[in-house]
């Protein structure tokens, strides 16, 4: 199974890139984690946020590989513990499809992305900076993988 992380924003701070890549490289080949960056729309004091969200959403959905299971990262989503996320990963594997996880920009995801999602995952009730979410998602997925494979990374 391939995990596809589709995120808005292309010029991340170095610590975000290093943090994401640290977990990305730990995944085995049979569960590769791929990052696809979508250019963020230009935001200014008079920006049309609805139009920007719409365009970002179109680009995100165009990046989803055909037939993938889509998971949006969104506040109304389901909170998963590490064991519950590990269980979700097992279900995704048994489903036989690759998984695309969608991370929006500063204003979140477009309505089209939310509607296209098969599932919605809420990392926290806190508002998190969208660059940091990349690192948290990569680590959480790696930890869930380690639970499923009895790797010593996760300890209870």
From Swiss-Prot:
Cellular compartments annotated: Cytoplasm
The protein's name in its UniProt record: Ribosomal RNA large subunit methyltransferase H
Species this chain originates from: Shewanella frigidimarina (strain NCIMB 400)
MF annotations from Gene Ontology: rRNA (pseudouridine-N3-)-methyltransferase activity
Listed EC numbers: 2.1.1.177
Subunit structure comment from the entry: Homodimer.
Coiled-coil annotated residue ranges, if any: none
One Pfam family, short name: SPOUT_MTase
Protein family: Belongs to the RNA methyltransferase RlmH family.
Task of the protein: Specifically methylates the pseudouridine at position 1915 (m3Psi1915) in 23S rRNA.
